[in-house]
From Swiss-Prot:
It holds the Pfam family NADH5_C. It is found in: Mitochondrion inner membrane. Its EC number is 7.1.1.2. Belongs to the complex I subunit 5 family. InterPro entries: NADH_DH_su5_C, NADHpl_OxRdtase_5_subgr, ND/Mrp_TM, NU5C-like, Proton_antipo_N. This is NADH-ubiquinone oxidoreductase chain 5. It comes from Ceratotherium simum (White rhinoceros).
């Protein structure tokens, strides 16, 4: 059984080789990206061996411990937990990153710092692997903060642009709010259980776990961009497209969902936290789907679709189905990375044009990218027998047969319908109709680096869901019966979304532009959320700070307490001590009045 951790550790160590070898300069800048890509492909093949063996062995988990240090009564160890979640996730993350690395070699070929870019992407992947294999909170926190700082460095890659720097700061600040919840939970577990090992935390199973679980939910809200802490996710599109693809598919944004899956043994009996989780996910998936409907930036549409799918995963955890949430994480990684790569191909060929209103007619000019974009969008909507269907259909069916909050489940169904609507709108504006781009643009998608990377993810977007869902626990699922209308709900709402979007697009294609309506403004301006929360609190905070500083420091301390108090004290003491009051004018006036009256009285009357 030692073979499982040994092989997984081998694949992890293989990933560190390119970072270690850069200190010796064994590879030139031109060959380094190829070296990194090959290492990741070898690590993927290596990780498949223990994964296959683990699935067929029927084991529940394998834990490897190496004692690190003891702080009084707290024992810290390097502990790796190889269970179903980590054993499946690692090959998926490696496969997707392999394709993204190959795509980056085409997309970033003219970047002068491409070696550093590949190092950052590799560190991003390594920190995510540390996070998913961690068996204690301290190790998990290292991976958690690692993906956070790497996202900051990668989003601000083009640091010459103000928008990129602002977006990176926004991402790190929103994640700081989530980290408060994580640290609070770590402190609670340390004081109440005297341990950070997951197994010991779960074995104690306290009844009053509302506070740490709400802290973990806050952490997941920040990292997985749930409603309230979501604005950083669309802003993160300021980074290069390979960063967007990696960030949204198999690394940072799913870390929050993965954290909740890890702590599900504590959540499953806590109805309060489950209700909060369900409602938060439902609001997120609907709100971000509404925002995606009117966006014109192709990358922002896909970004909002990510946030909507993350909301769906949170809903799944809220209805007590962590395995289905994990299945959706794995299936979502394939088609979401492919959608970003297709958008990157379109943007690159159209001279960095991201507005879908300035595209159109690309189906003939870019047939391979167009086909991949359509298949990816269909997989996203849950079209039968594509990868997304195997997870999304199961989630909708489970939600329909659960006895929890009906309003939250209805909202989720509406969001599922809107997914089809904004996907259809994106395809309609980007690929169909007449070309609206500049006529001088030369389009060429026949680059093997681009085509091979998208091809791999295209195969994954068609077949991966079938293979992963066949190996999900429990492997022997009892046959359930449900009415046909419940079984067909997911497909029905998806088709409804397709039809609605197509009809509206065709009906409004030749209409003149009118003044935008209130619902359009609400959707296009992201529910006024960034405007209110990015302008109002800083303004109020600055004005309050300014007033308090001027009142407390200037008026009270520097004026009233020190100078004026001393002068007033001296005036009062001088008036008490001195005989003269110093009223010269009054003295002269009284003298004049007295003199006048005396003269009037003493003058002889004629």
């Amino acid at each position: 059984m030692n073979m499982f951790p040994s092989l997984m550790l081998t694949s992890l160590l293989m990933l560190t080789l390119p970072i270690i070898t850069t200190t010796i300069n064994t590879h030139k800048n031109s060959t380094y990206p190829y070296y990194v890509k090959n290492i990741i492909s070898y690590a993927f093949i290596t990780s498949l061996i223990p994964t296959m063996m683990f699935i067929h062995s029927g084991q529940e988990m394998i834990i490897s411990n190496w004692h690190w240090m003891t702080i009084q009564t707290l024992k810290l160890s390097l502990s790796f937990k190889l269970d179903y979640f980590s054993m499946i996730f690692v090959p998926v993350a490696l496969f997707v990153t392999w394709s993204i690395m190959e795509f980056s070699m085409w997309y970033m070929h003219s970047d002068p710092h491409i070696t550093q870019f590949f190092k950052y992407l590799l560190m991003f992947l390594i920190t995510m692997m540390i996070l998913v294999t961690a068996n204690n909170l301290f190790q998990l926190f290292i991976g958690w903060e690692g993906v956070g700082i790497m996202s900051f460095l990668l989003i601000s890659w083009w640091y010459g642009r103000t928008d990129a720097n602002t977006a990176a700061l926004q991402a790190i600040l929103y994640n700081r709010i989530g980290d408060i919840g994580f640290i609070m939970s770590m402190a609670w577990f340390l004081f109440n259980t005297n341990s950070w090992d997951l197994q010991q935390i779960f074995s104690l199973n306290y009844n009053h776990t509302d506070l740490p679980l709400m802290g973990l939910l806050l952490a997941a809200t920040g990292k997985s961009a749930q409603f309230g802490l979501h604005p950083w996710l669309p802003s993160a599109m300021e980074g290069p497209t390979p960063v967007s693809a990696l960030l949204h598919s198999s690394t940072m944004v799913v870390a929050g969902v993965f954290l909740l899956i890890r702590f599900h043994p504590l959540m499953e009996n806590n109805k309060t936290v489950q209700t909060f989780t369900l409602c938060l996910g439902a609001i997120t998936t609907l709100f971000t789907a509404i925002c995606a409907l009117t966006q014109n930036d192709i990358k922002k549409i896909i970004a909002f679709s990510t946030s909507s799918q993350l909301g769906l995963m949170i809903v799944t955890i809220g209805i007590n189905q962590p395995y289905l949430a994990f299945l959706h994480i794995c299936t979502h990684a394939f088609f979401k990375a492919m959608l970003f790569m297709c958008s990157g191909s379109i943007i690159h060929n159209l001279n960095d044009e991201q507005d879908i209103r300035k595209m159109g007619g690309l189906f003939k000019a870019m047939p391979f990218t167009s086909t991949s974009l359509i298949i990816g969008s269909l997989a996203l909507t849950g079209m039968p027998f594509l990868t997304g269907f195997y997870s999304k259909d199961l989630i909708i069916e489970t939600a329909n047969t659960s006895y929890t909050n009906a309003w939250a489940l209805l909202i989720t169904l509406i969001a599922t319908s809107l997914t089809a609507a904004y996907s259809t709108r994106m395809i309609f504006f980007t690929l169909l109709g007449q070309p609206r781009s500049l006529t001088l643009i030369t389009i060429n998608e026949n680059n093997p680096l681009l085509m091979n990377s998208i091809k791999r993810l295209l195969i994954g977007s068609i077949f991966a869901g079938f293979f992963i869902s066949n190996n999900i626990y429990p492997t022997t699922i009892p046959k359930t019966t449900m009415p046909h209308y419940l079984k067909l709900t997911a497909l029905a709402v998806t088709i409804l979304g397709f039809m609605m979007a197509l009809e509206l697009s065709l009906a409004t294609y030749n209409l003149k532009l009118k003044h935008p309506s209130s619902p359009l403004k609400f959707s296009n301006l992201l529910g006024y959320f960034p405007t209110i929360f990015h302008r109002l609190p800083p303004l109020m905070g600055l004005s309050t700070s300014q007033k308090s500083a001027s009142l407390l420091l200037d008026l009270i301390w520097l004026e009233k307490i020190l100078p004026k108090s001393i002068s007033q004290f001296q005036v009062k003491t001088s008036t008490l001590v001195s005989n003269q009051k110093g009223l010269i004018k009054l003295y002269f006036l009284s003298f004049l009045v007295t003199l006048t009256l005396s003269l009037l009285l003493l003058m002889p009357h004629g």
